[in-house]
């Protein structure tokens, strides 16, 4: 089958289905592809349920996660949609950011209302930066009583408010994924209504290229007669020749320098941008002034820190993680971007220990500063082996 050309003309948005087990996330994902296929057959292939359900495994920060990816288009947009088969896969995906979501469809069964995993997913969405939610009140064909539907809707809105989402304004669309998947026309219309709500309520993300310049340093070389070159992949923003940049992290002080050259594939460029693997020639910098693990950034856009609060997922032993719990003052390595830094863990009040397979909050104090901001992701390692993954929730100092 010929690969279809990726159309750059439409805005691209990443979304996913979240919610309690058996509330119909995967059925809804399949039904969306069916209804959009019927509405725009030239744009959308239909992806059947069983194809989404046997999601392939992928690795993110050393953690194996099952994630199904489907794509589809509405009139307005191109979507990449992720769906995970298991509850643990969701937690791992949301914490590691394996598949980043610009927004989510929260699936709640009208017959059950919000359940424990509904709450856990909403809390995680709030913490790990899934900024927007649209609600699909699923299995609405199985509830005849209008009052019950209204009560469930109210409960979902209250839950969203509890976790600081705008629960009163979030669109709640009553759907029946199964009926729509079976080809029922009226329920198919409701799914088009759901996607119209997603189009309208989940804004386009800010593109990486529009954010302040940042490049993690992977390697440092000296080129005789020209100076010091640092290489890496530009994470965000643009860097132009002759711009002033800062070198942040690892060392106690931040260094300012000028980029005198940008090279890619041995060619000189005027600028490098997000996604490019480049070498940057730095003025007046000695080989020993810079090292892997530091970042080159737009001045004043990010600062070095050592103490932070984080949300982490700890691998269980079947995933290659620890076999035993850890306690406060645990001292693993924290792998940020390109390097490991040792840190000391403090557990939240009332938590004595963390078991393999748990997800928890913790405070960490690193022995060296790292260029850090809220949302930054990291792996937790012991001697090069990944035992967990996390995300910075709050920078303390």
Curated annotation (Swiss-Prot):
Residues 62-66 are annotated as: G2. One of its GO terms (molecular function) is translation elongation factor activity. Residues 83-86 are annotated as: G3. Keywords: Cytoplasm, Elongation factor, GTP-binding, Hydrolase, Magnesium, Metal-binding, Nucleotide-binding, Protein biosynthesis. It catalyses: GTP + H2O = GDP + phosphate + H(+). The keyword Transmembrane does not apply. Pfam families: GTP_EFTU (PF00009), GTP_EFTU_D2 (PF03144), GTP_EFTU_D3 (PF03143). InterPro entries: EF-Tu_GTP-bd, EF-Tu_GTPase, EFTu-like_2, EFTU_2, G_TR_CS, P-loop_NTPase, Small_GTP-bd, T_Tr_GTP-bd_dom. Residues 176-178 are annotated as: G5. It is found in: Cytoplasm. One of its GO terms (cellular component) is cytosol. Belongs to the TRAFAC class translation factor GTPase superfamily. Classic translation factor GTPase family. EF-Tu/EF-1A subfamily. HAMAP family: EF_Tu_B. This is Elongation factor Tu. It comes from Parafrankia sp. (strain EAN1pec). The gene is tuf.
């Amino acid at each position: 089958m010929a690969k279809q050309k990726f159309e750059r003309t439409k805005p691209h948005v990443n979304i996913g289905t979240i919610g309690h087990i058996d509330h119909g996330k995967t059925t809804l994902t399949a039904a969306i592809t069916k209804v959009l296929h019927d509405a725009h057959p030239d744009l959308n292939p239909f992806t059947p349920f069983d194809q989404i359900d046997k999601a392939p495994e992928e690795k993110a920060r050393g953690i194996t996660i099952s994630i199904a990816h489907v794509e589809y288009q509405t009139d307005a947009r191109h979507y990449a949609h992720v769906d995970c088969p298991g509850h643990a896969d969701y937690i791992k995906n949301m914490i590691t950011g394996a598949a980043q979501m610009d927004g989510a469809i929260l699936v709640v069964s009208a017959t059950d209302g919000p359940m424990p995993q509904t709450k856990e997913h909403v809390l995680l969405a709030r913490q790990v930066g899934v900024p927007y939610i649209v609600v699909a009140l699923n299995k609405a064909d199985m509830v005849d009583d209008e009052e019950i539907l209204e009560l469930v809707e109210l409960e979902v809105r209250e839950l969203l408010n509890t976790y600081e989402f705008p629960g009163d304004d979030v669109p709640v669309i009553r759907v029946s994924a199964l009926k729509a998947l079976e080809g029922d026309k009226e329920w198919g219309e409701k799914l088009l209504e759901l996607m119209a709500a997603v189009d309208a309520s989940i804004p386009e993300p800010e593109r990486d290229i529009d954010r302040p310049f940042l490049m993690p340093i992977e390697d440092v070389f000296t080129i005789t007669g020209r100076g010091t070159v640092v290489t890496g992949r530009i994470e965000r923003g643009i860097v132009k020749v002759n711009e002033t940049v800062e070198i942040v992290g690892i060392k106690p002080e931040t260094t300012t320098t000028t980029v005198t050259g940008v090279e890619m594939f041995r060619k000189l460029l005027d600028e490098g941008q997000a996604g490019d693997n480049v070498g940057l020639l730095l003025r007046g910098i000695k080989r020993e002034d810079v090292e892997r693990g530091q970042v080159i950034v737009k001045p004043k856009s990010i600062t070095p820190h050592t103490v932070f609060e984080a949300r982490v997922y700890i691998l269980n032993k079947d995933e290659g993680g620890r076999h035993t719990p850890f306690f406060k003052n645990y001292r693993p390595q924290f792998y940020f971007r390109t390097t490991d830094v040792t840190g000391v863990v403090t557990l939240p009040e009332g938590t004595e220990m963390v078991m393999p397979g748990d997800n928890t909050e913790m405070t960490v104090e690193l022995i060296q500063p790292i260029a850090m901001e809220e949302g930054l992701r990291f792996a937790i390692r012991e001697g090069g082996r990944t035992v967990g993954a996390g995300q910075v929730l709050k920078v303390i100092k």
